[in-house]
């Protein structure tokens, strides 16, 4: 029997307070509980969605080479990224603009086909994906994943978030904005 939902993500970190503050800012969340070694953050009615443990010194992850991205190297085992879904294009872009005003920028923005996604690096250089679903139903998204377009390019095409904001604010329909070339 499958689970009913993904309940939470827990990060072990040397930077509990910085991580807690970053996730509160990025996800629009708030702290439910904290002490010097442990924090619980939520952004909805759940008791916690993200937690942070600081049990003592950890060896930092190596930086990826090239591209100037301050993200963890991808040739090490472990979690690649964690994704959070917004309810609409407007919500995703409002959050992008809010974070941009605070100096938090995505290191990569991709229309995957099933999702429109922006990737950020947290203070420990974990990758966090903020996304919207591009299809009205999961079944439509899954069907598109069996298309020749997805088979030829399963990763997607990069986009400029500022250009997407400009088009959205100009009134281009969301249905057109999420079409992957």
Model-identified regions with their sequence ranges:
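Vicinal oxygen chelate
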Residues: 4, 11-18, 76-127, 132-141, ...
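N-terminal "first-domain core" detector
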Residues: 6-44
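Short N-terminal helix-initiation segments at or just after the protein's N-terminus
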Residues: 14-28, 53, 57-69, 94, ...
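Conserved short beta-strand elements that form part of the metal-binding/catalytic scaffold
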Residues: 30-76, 121, 127-135
